[in-house]
């Protein structure tokens, strides 16, 4: 994942500072400041990475770092980025589907003419995803009496449960 993105970006004349895996947020932020980074990219291969990405976005906001944050990797998604990561910071957060799309996204983010359109489209997409997510979780509660009136009718009168067979072997009821 991240290694492929690094190679693809480097082949397109971008300088990539690869800090490795499981790097603390503080180290990434310090490196971004030290190298005057234009973009920070995070890759998530395992599920716990998703929470770390949210924490990292919070730290970027706390530090006042406004540069774009690219999100990618096997466990990531547009929906997770829109619902969990993007709202945690005021700067741009862009989910990139795969390594081949990292170059056009990076190019657009660094081009003053393309950047506004990309960010506007991304934010509109994220807003729609957040709205859909919110609606999905808003299910009206059915009153207890209505739920009881709608129960499955089962006639228990006269029902005799089967008696378990005695002994070993396969049995049929």
Predicted segments, located by residue:
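Charged, low-complexity, helix/coiled-coil-prone segments
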Residues: 1-4, 50, 148-155
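Cofactor-cradling patches in redox/metallo enzymes
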Residues: 2-12, 17-88
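Short acidic-hydrophobic, aromatic-tinged amphipathic segments that line or gate anion-handling sites
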Residues: 92-98
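Active-site loops and adjacent core secondary-structure elements that bind or stabilize anionic groups
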Residues: 98-173
């Amino acid at each position: 994942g991240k290694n492929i993105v690094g190679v693809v970006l480097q082949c397109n004349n971008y300088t990539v500072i690869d800090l490795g895996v499981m790097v603390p947020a503080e180290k990434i932020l310090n490196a971004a400041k030290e190298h005057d980074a234009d973009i920070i990219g995070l890759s998530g291969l395992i599920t716990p990475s998703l929470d770390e990405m949210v924490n990292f976005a919070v730290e970027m906001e706390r530090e006042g770092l406004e540069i774009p944050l690219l999100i990618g990797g096997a466990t990531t998604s547009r929906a997770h980025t829109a619902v969990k990561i993007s709202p945690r910071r005021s700067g741009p957060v862009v989910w990139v589907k795969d390594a081949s799309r990292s170059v056009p996204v990076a190019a657009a983010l660094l081009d003053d003419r393309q950047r506004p359109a990309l960010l506007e489209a991304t934010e509109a997409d994220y807003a729609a995803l957040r709205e859909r997510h919110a609606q999905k979780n808003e299910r009206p509660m059915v009153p207890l009496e209505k739920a009881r009136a709608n129960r499955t009718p089962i006639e228990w009168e006269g029902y005799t449960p089967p008696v378990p067979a005695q002994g070993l072997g396969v049995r049929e009821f």
